[in-house]
Swiss-Prot record:
A Gene Ontology term for the protein's cellular component: extracellular space
GO biological process, one term: feeding behavior
This protein's name: Neuropeptide Y
Family: Belongs to the NPY family.
Cell location: Secreted
Keyword Secreted: yes
Main subcellular localisation: secreted
Domain of life: Eukaryota
Pfam hit, one: Hormone_3
Length: 36
């Protein structure tokens, strides 16, 4: 199973948050693809 991305926290810089959210979206896509 893929590793869940680490949440950078509320006070993280915007680019860190953007990187986290794209990684999280990719992670969710991987999991949902495996399930179906």
């Amino acid at each position: 199973y893929p590793i869940k991305p680490e949440n950078p926290g509320e006070d993280a810089p915007a680019d860190e948050l953007a990187k986290y959210y794209s990684a999280l979206r990719h992670y969710i896509n991987l999991i949902t693809r495996q399930r179906y």
